């Protein structure tokens, strides 16, 4: 199976390239920046390049994008639209033109935007939560999701969307805290899209992909107002590690990302969870 991975020099894209190669896929990595996981320098805004590099492919995993950090670098709205929306459309059209069967689009949990705010309790974030974009990044991702839906319905392209959780470089304490409720290890993200390559979707699907959480809906009020008490209920052994490192538990947790649908549909089982990382740190290891 021949797979094109865009954004192959990025954090998720590079790990995805290596993960797929480990499973015997023929992978072509494409990015505007050179790296060991990038085979061809290509720009998603270039229609002819996208037509060329999708030729002969069985699937495209599209991770290339401008992200939230690019807003801090003063990229314009036009830049976001050109790269994220027009670039995605170029790839979708190229897939149809070249008979590519599958298109896997990495979106973001940031797209829930204003729906993530509740003064009374943590928000349960599954795919039924309303999308309420807060900025140009969210807006472009929402538009791309709808383009994927359009191509699934009208062109017969097996386009699916993966709203991935947070996987930014972070200090150990912050990374560990985020794994409790909103984080994602890019290795788990790569595994989710690998599983999707072998799944035949009968309808258009959007799937949240995160490290998962042991928290339940009945914990939501307490998580908002006394998160440490809830954490101790599930992970009493964490107290020793946090105290030894002078780390602080979050006092309030504002959301819980649910990947239950991804588990149910694809059999997704994240490995690099809070519990896994807790054990690694407790044994003196870090990844």
Whereabouts are the PLM-identified features?
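N-terminal Rossmann NAD(P)H-binding glycine-rich loop of SDR-like oxidoreductase domains
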Residues: 3-23
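SDR active-site strand-loop-helix element
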Residues: 6, 30, 60-64, 103-109, ...
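NAD(P)H-binding glycine-rich loop region in Rossmannoid oxidoreductase-like domains
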Residues: 36, 44-83
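NAD(P)-cofactor binding segment of oxidoreductase domains
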Residues: 60, 74-103
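Catalytic helix-loop patch of NAD(P)-dependent Rossmann-fold dehydrogenases
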Residues: 82, 86, 117-159
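Conserved Rossmann-fold NAD(P)-dependent oxidoreductase catalytic core, especially the SDR/UDP-sugar
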Residues: 90-132
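Glycine/proline-rich active-site loop of Rossmann-fold NAD(P)-dependent oxidoreductases
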Residues: 142, 154-157, 169-179, 186, ...
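C-terminal substrate-binding subdomain of Rossmann-fold SDR/epimerase-dehydratase oxidoreductases
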Residues: 191-287
